Amino acid sequence: MMATLNLPPGFDFTDPDIYAERLPVDELAELRRVAPIWWNEQPIGAGGFDDGGFWVVTRHKDVKEVSRRSDVFSSLKKTALPRYKDGTVGEQVERGKYVLLNQDAPHHTHLRKIISRAFTPRAVERLRDELNTRAQEIVKTAAAEGSGDFVEQVACELPLQAIAGLMGVPQEDRMKLFHWSNQMVGDMDPEFAGNDAISASVELISYGMQLAAERAANPGDDLVTKLVQADVEGHKLSDDEFGFFVILLAVAGNETTRNSITQGMMAFTEFPDQWELFKKERPATAADEIVRWATPVTSFQRTALVDTELSGVQIKAGQRVVMFYRSANFDEEVFEDPYRFNILRDPNPHVGFGGTGAHYCIGANLARMTIDLMFNAIADHMPNLRPLAEPERLRSGWLNGIKHWQVDYVGTAQ
């Protein structure tokens, strides 16, 4: 099968240098057609792993199957991130195993039960008015500037406010949260070369612990209080679990939604008919199409615990299996005209919040609401937004990130 592929020798689907320039759209489409489960060879030590490579899973049905079979495909074994900064050693990868993202059942089940109490539709809905007011303020303030960096001035703040609001983080501390989360996900990008992801994570964890101590003494109506008081089947969160959960919230909740907002606006400028439609109709289906189109997390991985097979391909115990959500979300067998941005797409069974199963994004409702509120505000106050430059992409092996995007907010540029 490999002989029929047009991939250059040594092509690596988690190579951050590729994502700094572009998404490997054509290469993934070719794999879906020719070799939907393909062995990606890697030199020993590449991206923090010494196992010689991984399986690239490109089709929607296979991504969903790997997600579902959590008894066979483990998040814990080698964590869910398919790429670490080159030079990362095994102990550093091991340290991430406390994060909910990297847990397996039954421990994952206990933790998720505790945390899910904070993400009920009612808990999320309670934030709507505050976040709507904030979204309108963010967009009005940026519009008054005339032009600027859409990522920094528009996209980044509301996702952070949503998570911080849920956690009960005081307003004066919220920019610290933003700063730490940026440092943690940008560690493969030269712009953030001075960043120390480890130090940022330590600061974030210690901030979380401090917040927990305050809430233990003075409970509030927020996520941190719920986590501190939580007891599911005799299980309370340990300090490590709590600290790493704060990291997951600050990074997973903030970075992914921010990138969806930026990439969604990029899509609207590329498909102006959809922007006209959105401004008139404000369809409820738009947020899911924005997430499908953006797929902010390009891929996560699992590791086979036993010899198994996936769509006829033999997978050995210990081999990594990387689910390319980006590919699954453009699978021609599932999505009609997948390369058309269509805000009325319904049904839209995208895997932008992860596949089905135990690790489906716990904050999906909050993300949808944040995206909705933000685009409503943009349509209200920046209906004629125009790009001034090409977006600058983040160098990352798994996050489809945009660092900067210069735009004209009022639409005077031609």
Mark where each language-model region is.
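Cytochrome P450
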Residues: 1-414
